[in-house]
Design a protein with these regions (language model features):
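Conserved N-terminal alpha-helix of the aminotransferase class I/II PLP-enzyme fold
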Residues: 13-61, 83-88, 94
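Conserved core of the PLP fold type I
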Residues: 53-73, 103-110
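Conserved PLP-anchoring active-site segment centered on the Schiff-base-forming lysine
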Residues: 71-89, 118
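Conserved C-terminal alpha-helix-loop-beta "cap" of PLP-dependent enzymes
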Residues: 74-76, 268-343
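PLP-dependent aminotransferase-class I/II
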Residues: 99-144, 151-158
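Active-site C-terminal subdomain of aminotransferase-like
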Residues: 108, 135-136, 142, 150, ...
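Catalytic PLP-binding core of fold-type I/II PLP enzymes
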Residues: 151-183
Length: 345
């Protein structure tokens, strides 16, 4: 069976394994206070046009989101998210467990819009009794979204303007950040994110690392005490250099971008095959997640050779499924899938 169900079904990129092996007999100080974490921070900062930021390394995305958002907010403040936002659907109530309400707004093509955010923020101010309500304070975005769609620079600038107008923090979940920044139509850079967000994280788990995410805190208001809050929540890895070394390997020669770009290109080949076969795509995007509408029979046929992910039932005869490529996807695997799509009834 060939796996197209997600982008974290392999270990790590060979260059990362090589770096880990070569340094395995060396000893370092703990808790991300080591040369490799410093090198990784510097390599990332090289892409931020000199922005003054703090960078913290953690294990996984849900951990980053739960720790960061709880640290950034007062107990009575809430988070604006798309209904299909990862924190709203797929983090087992991690945010709510910290005591914060998620205000879920209907997504437009998988994304929030500046108008939706402004309307929600204005409704709070117009309520007549805001002191009886949670205060919307942070906007949560994912790019790519849960449906592979991405934000343009203009969309982010519009959302930033609304956040400034209403005093909201802007936070971006970057679990699949590489697949967005490497997409053929992406006009956003890491430097733009450092300019437009208050905090964002650079995903490693889904982009070549064994595990690991790099949280970039831009807004100075959000930095004080963050390391201690992370430790209190169990998010500080004693052997922190294992994370720093991985991110340094990904960013020292832009490996992060080349391996995710290849995944995007392979995903486009899959999408093209589905479209040429007369099938409908649920969303249009240029990243590594492709959502297609299949008949039950077509899904059963492809399911004999490939593992892919069910998304939702369309009707009694059709379902929407996700095919996902990654840094580890082989060209031959995609070629075989394309061949089977072409002969599929």
């Amino acid at each position: 069976m060939i796996r197209f169900n997600n982008d974290y079904n392999h270990g790590a990129h060979p260059e990362i394994l090589k770096a880990l092996q070569e340094t395995n007999t060396e000893s370092y100080g703990g808790y991300s206070r080591d040369p490799w974490c410093e090198k990784a921070r510097e390599a990332i900062r090289q892409h931020l046009n000199g922005a003054d930021v703090d960078i913290h390394f953690m294990i996984g995305g849900t951990q980053v989101n739960a720790i960061a958002l709880s640290a950034f907010l007062r107990p009575y403040q809430s988070i604006i998210s798309a209904t299909n936002g990862h924190i709203n659907l797929h983090e087992a109530g991690a945010i709510e467990h910290t005591g914060h309400k998620i205000v879920a707004l209907p997504a437009v093509n998988g994304k929030l819009t500046a108008d939706l955010i402004a309307a929600e923020a204005q409704a709070y101010h117009d309520s007549g009794c805001p002191e009886y309500m949670t205060e919307p304070k942070l906007v949560f975005l994912s790019s790519p979204s849960e449906y592979g769609t991405t934000y343009t620079k203009a969309e982010l600038e519009g959302i930033r303007q609304v956040c400034d107008q209403y005093g909201l923090y802007l936070y971006l979940d970057g679990a699949r950040l590489g697949y967005w920044l490497s997409a053929s139509d992406c006009d956003v850079t890491l430097a733009d994110l450092a300019r437009l967000t208050d905090a964002f994280y650079i995903g490693g788990t889904k982009c070549g690392c064994l595990m690991g995410e790099a949280l970039v805190i831009v807004n100075p208001e959000l930095r004080h005490g963050f390391w201690t809050a992370t430790k209190q929540s169990g998010g500080v890895l004693a052997k922190g250099w294992l994370l720093g070394l991985q991110f340094y390997t990904l960013f020292k020669d832009d490996l992060y971008f080349s391996i995710t770009r290849q995944a995007d290109e392979l995903a486009t080949q899959i999408e093209t095959a589905f479209v040429n076969a007369g099938l409908s795509m649920y969303t249009k995007n240029t990243t590594n997640q492709k959502f297609v509408i299949l008949s039950n029979e077509q899904a059963e046929y492809l399911g004999k050779s490939y593992i892919f992910e069910f998304d939702h039932k369309v009707d009694d005869e059709h379902i929407c499924v996700r095919f996902c490529t990654s840094w580890s996807t082989e060209t031959t695997e995609v070629q075989q899938l394309v061949k089977d799509i072409c002969i599929m009834k």
